[in-house]
Amino acid sequence: MLKQYLYDDLVFLDKEYKDYEDLLSDIMNTLVSKHYVEREFEGALLEREKEFPTGLQLDGYAVAIPHGGSQYVLKDFISLVTLKNPIRMNRMDNPEEALEVDILFMIGFSKSETHLQCLKQLMGLIQDPKVIEDLKKGTSITSVL
């Protein structure tokens, strides 16, 4: 199910950003210009991340899955960003604590049922250290999914 929402123009490998806002601004330019979302999606993501952080500390690596603002999604998508240098984001399980995120999956879905199904599959996928290692190496995302 995940493959059908992942597009080549939304895969960003070995990128450098100073922080989450810098990353979000860059990815949003692509999402808006390619008609995946309306510009308001950015504000919705920032707000949601403040209230309900999406950073997950797993076994030896950290991942974030920012999502939200379904009313601004024009075309359902999953965007993958691997980072040259980790960025600080707050933890999902302890919002007051930050962690260094290596990989980010930004997702946008117009329907909550699709959103929940894909989020569940993504959560299962990211718990496999081999998958994360392959993504960091730049292995084809579609072969990993």
What residue ranges belong to the model's regions?
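Cytosolic covalent-transfer regions centered on His/Cys nucleophiles
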Residues: M1-L145
